[in-house]
C-alpha cells in the first residue's frame, strides 16, 4: 500500500484512504 501513497503523491484525497494501511487515517 505504501506504493499507492507515492502514486497519489501523499496529498490527494485518495491518498488519505491509503494512509489507513500506512500510518495516518
UniProtKB/Swiss-Prot annotation:
Keyword terms of this UniProt record: Capsid protein, DNA-binding, Host cytoplasm, Viral genome packaging, Viral release from host cell, Virion
Tagged with keyword DNA-binding: yes
Any one GO MF annotation of this record: DNA binding
Top-level division of the source organism's lineage: Viruses
Stretches that traverse the bilayer: none
Quaternary data: Interacts with F protein.
Protein name, entry field: DNA-binding protein J
Lineage of the organism: Viruses, Monodnaviria, Sangervirae, Phixviricota, Malgrandaviricetes
Amino acid at each position: 500500500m505504501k506504493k499507492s501513497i507515492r502514486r497519489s503523491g501523499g496529498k490527494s484525497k485518495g491518498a488519505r484512504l491509503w494512509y489507513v494501511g500506512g500510518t495516518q487515517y
